[in-house]
Regions:
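HhH-family (HhH-GPD) DNA N-glycosylase catalytic core used in base-excision repair
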Residues: 2-479
Length: 479
């Protein structure tokens, strides 16, 4: 009965049917956290499905596809369940690819610091009216409202979880003045930002910040750590049985990051050292993508289980996550180095590369362009490919359709479809991209008693959409 109800909730979610959403609200199921928000007319607040408060009467509930839509309707966020802590909307929200690309750019700050909607639309190649119509249809709010809500929610998160000065939080959240931040905060939440700091210890500029990132269970933390451990670079990353650590650099500020998982509370804990408040938004975005925090495991499992070969793998490894990238260029370089050699061999060469550059961090595009790469174990062709990638990396625009990005990558010497798809899958976190022509996928199917050709695999993968990346991950597990 529970599984049947889960399927109904998933398949009807996008329509936000009142009875179905209310059933999810009553059960406080964390698997639906962030997939909708409940506006309660009797209190004027909106909540997450997991809110510990008494369940409101159904006639007092209105369901919204985003926090922005709830705020736009006049509701204020609940102080108990704190909607600012909810996982972000799943990447598949709305089947419209333009919406996904626009959301990614907004998350990267495309509408912060006075940047205009017309500039965003120019990058996307569509008109403002059309983009507003798409956002209203899929998210219940305009692009500017979505961007404003994200700024406010991140600021609220920092106010609650850190001791950073309010001025720094305002600027670090994407507001270009403290006055505008205060006005927007009061309008959205009904009180000043300073209210969040009442009865709390004094503001300080500390070298260590702790942030929490809620996720939808289940979460295959052990599987993700295993993937990262096998590929960890000696001078940069440390992966233990329970945590992932790495050195980081944001706009010239060197620091470190340690992430662990609290499965009981369905959240990751990130300890960030020596990174100013102004750059915590960037760090937060990178963490969410690296650990695939906003994935929808219920939807993924539901769709992939239609394939009888994948069904037992999905059951055996619930909550599989797509390993993302701290830095997209790093993954691209490692993908090229890893062409046609083992994971261990690629790791050895990457360690030599990091040691050769000597900064204690993964090399930037400029550093690789100007570096002597001879003697690392790379062929002359690989070196040429790395130099060309470094020269052209900045020209790859996330606003473009993914098909165009794949074509641009494949146009570079030494990069074929496998490498291009792998780069886009991990660097851009694309859930529906997988490395075509990957022999390990064919080996996985063969081990599962389903030998097939590349053409057969391509046809089979059409049934995994929009989760082909996750389907590939499951077959890699089997291989």
């Amino acid at each position: 009965m529970a599984s049947f109800m889960l399927i109904i909730l998933y398949t009807t979610f996008m329509n936000l049917e009142h009875d179905i959403c209310y059933q999810a609200l009553k059960t406080r199921d964390a698997r639906f956290d962030g997939r909708f928000f409940t506006g309660v007319s009797s209190t004027g607040i909106f909540c997450r499905p997991i809110c510990p408060a008494s369940t409101p009467k159904p006639e007092n509930c209105t369901f919204y596809p985003s926090a922005s839509a709830a705020i736009n309707a006049g509701f204020r966020p609940c102080l108990r369940c704190r909607p600012e802590s909810a996982p972000a909307s799943p990447a598949w929200l709305g089947t419209e690819a333009t919406v996904r690309r626009a959301l990614r750019l907004i998350e990267d700050g495309a509408l912060d610091d006075g940047q205009s909607l017309s500039e965003l639309c120019a990058r996307l190649g569509i008109g403002e009216r059309h983009l507003r119509r798409l956002f209203q249809s899929h998210l219940g709010a305009s692009p500017k409202q979505i961007a404003q809500t994200r700024r406010l929610m991140f600021a609220k998160k920092l106010l609650v979880q850190t001791k950073a000065p309010i001025t720094e939080i305002a600027l670090g959240s994407g507001f270009n003045s403290l006055r505008r931040f205060n006005d927007a905060y009061k309008t959205a939440f009904g009180f000043a930002p300073s209210h969040e700091r009442k009865n709390k210890s004094e503001e300080t500029n500390t070298q260590e910040t702790v942030l929490h990132f809620n996720f939808r269970p289940p979460y295959d933390w052990d599987g993700l750590l295993s993937f990262f451990k096998e590929r960890a670079l000696d001078e940069i990353e440390t992966v233990s049985m329970t945590s992932y650590e790495r050195l980081i650099c944001i706009e010239g500020h060197k620091g470190s990051l340690r992430v662990s998982c609290d499965e009981k509370k369905n959240r990751l804990k990130a300890v960030i050292k020596d990174i100013p408040t102004a750059h915590l938004k960037t760090v937060s975005r990178k963490i969410r993508r690296l650990f695939d925090v906003d994935a929808d495991p219920v939807g993924i499992a539901h769709d992939l289980s239609h394939d009888p070969v994948l069904m037992p793998l999905v059951k055996a490894h619930p909550g599989l996550r797509l390993p993302g990238a701290w830095d997209g260029f790093e993954i691209a370089v490692r993908a090229i180095i890893g062409q046609q050699i083992s994971v261990k061999g690629a790791r050895t060469i990457c360690n030599r590369l990091v040691e050769r550059i000597g900064t204690g961090l993964f090399p930037t595009a400029d550093e690789i362009m100007n570096a002597d790469l001879d003697g690392l174990g790379l062929t002359g062709r690989r070196i040429t490919t790395l130099k060309k990638l470094s020269e052209n990396w900045c020209g790859l625009d996330k606003a473009k359709p993914v098909e165009e990005t794949l074509k641009e990558l494949c146009a570079l010497p030494g990069i074929g479809p496998w490498t291009a798809h792998y780069i886009v899958m991990r660097s851009f976190g694309e859930p529906d991209i997988y490395p075509v022509d990957d022999l390990a996928l064919l080996r996985g199917l063969e081990k599962l008693g389903q030998p097939c050709t590349k053409a057969d695999l391509k046809e089979r993968a059409q049934n995994w959409r929009p989760w082909r990346a996750y389907g590939a991950l499951y077959l890699w597990r089997a291989s």
